């Protein structure tokens, strides 16, 4: 009952209060039990209004930021989404209620194993999980309608352009020299239209300038 109450409060005071108003997204956050994607020592902070670090480097995004990033994707029941930096599986579980198929990528081995276990325990069947370097993704010509990046980038994600369908969208947090903010990239031929969508920050997930994920073990 405690988690149920906290989850309801999170939806109302963190998501809806920050203008995440799509009822399908709110419904997904209401259904998915974040505590089930955390180790026992972290369950007590499951619905805190902050990022949750599951080990020294990997984290689950703050709920309202995750919700707003998702709300800026192309939300269609028959569309696909690539979930980059899915950590222990929470973001993929949220997306699984909104998209036909979720392709989930996590580079940290511990998080990947927890992710696999959690998705199985929750009986989520429309997520396909990969343990990959984020900057070297190869889906053998497959293209996606959407890409969600669960953290900050320090450069535009040109390495993803061939993975997007025409007019496909990427949402992420972008860090420039002075500020961090959420962005939406829309594929136009061989380039992106880049749109600043709201102020936000998170830990760095992909270090594009060093051509390797920020956190690799």
What is each PLM-predicted segment?
Residues 43-54, 169-172, 179:
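Short, surface-exposed polybasic-and-hydrophobic patches located at secondary-structure transitions
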